[in-house]
Swiss-Prot record:
GO cellular component: endoplasmic reticulum; Golgi apparatus; membrane
Ranges annotated as biased composition (Basic and acidic residues): 124-137
Transmembrane segments: 17-37, 57-77, 220-240, 256-276
Protein name: Palmitoyltransferase pfa5
Keywords: Acyltransferase, Lipoprotein, Membrane, Palmitate, Transferase, Transmembrane, Transmembrane helix
Main location per the UniProt record: membrane
Modifications after synthesis and translation: Autopalmitoylated.
Residue spans of biased composition, Basic residues class: 107-123
Region (Disordered) location: 96-137, 410-443
The organism's taxonomic lineage, starting at the top: Eukaryota, Fungi, Dikarya, Ascomycota, Pezizomycotina
Amino acid sequence: MARRAADKRVNLAVSRIIPPILIGVFGYASYAITKPLCVDYLIHPAHHYDRRSRSGAGAAILAIYYVLLIPVLATYLRLLYNVVLSPGYLPRGTACTQNQTGSDGSKHRHRRHRRRKSGHHLSKTTEKTDRSDGGDVERGLEYSARAKAYPLDAEGLESFYTKDVFVCQPDGRPVYCSTCCQFKTDRAHHCREVDRCVRKMDHFCPWVGGVVSETSFKFFIQFIVYTMIYCIFVLIVFAIYTAELRREAGRTNVHWIVCLALSSLFGFFTFGVAISSVQLAANNLTTIENLNRRSAVWTLAIRVPRHILSKRWAPTFRTITYPLPPVPPAESEVARESPGGEQHVFAILQTLPGENPFDLGSPLKNIQQVMGFSLLEWLLPIKQSPCADHSSNESAFALGPVVTRLKKEAGLEVSTESESADPVGAAETPQHEQRRGKHRRRN
């Protein structure tokens, strides 16, 4: 446990240190290619080079270099902005917040107690402090045990059952994080480095200052691809002129050698990461989901259409009805009444091993969910990814042929003829959509 906490602190510290260092590397490369190479060697050669001026080559290299550097810096700054200020964290549950507040209060009481007893004998102070700590820790653990119990019915479920499809556990409830005391939205993952649940988390990357998630994965791909192109250009330029200088003068320039090494290192690194990231986007997967993609089985709660519920229906699969029944009240509590309005019935279905319900069936469509639908969105770090918009009534993320097949096999496909033949259901549908729309705006 202590080792894990130490690793977490190290990772967080490194993620704060590396971005300024990386920006410094870009600054050093800009100096090396501008002054020692283009100015002192090509445009106005120093006397010890004994060469004629090649202003055209120097100007062209500078122009291309800074044209390539601008998108690298722009995407990196946008990436840092999203990682730091819009990381895609899920809010912690009320119980977790109260637990954290209680823990802070315990620490404050302990500090006051220690100051109050500071004049006593050392052995007596130690004895009393230990006893006080034991009481505080015990109360904290007692509260944590209650807070981490899985809630039978809790606020926040509405954001799930107002959708048509959501990822659930075998009992039909959304996945629950006992650390954050919160239901996890589809594809969310708990990151141990930041101790928070993150929407569509891809990985924790110290190079970009934190967690890469649905809010930053697009800009991460743009930065990696632009940096790869930038490094290839720098590598080629310094390789050519380093070889020329060594061949004609029998020596090398230390700045050129350093930039040659850095561009080689970062070039090969970004090439591999770019290929991997584009492949993940083409398959509509995250790095975490890709770890067990060949064996993963997704459990989905899929809404049972009204026209099926209005008939005599004998399901061959498990179902769950929302809102859930009220929890039996404690002695000092009043039981919450179950909402007396519309009920939402969901079928609990599972995919086959290796199937991805979020794969849209086309690499291009999958990439568009990350990069956008126009060429400008692919090139410029301006708009957010379409997958970060969860306003659809169907699901938090776009769904693919796997879900369509599951609906068909379970007999849950919405029939237009059946809906039109059911005036009651047809009359209730707009009201249902309006109710869900109000909830979405409220969120």
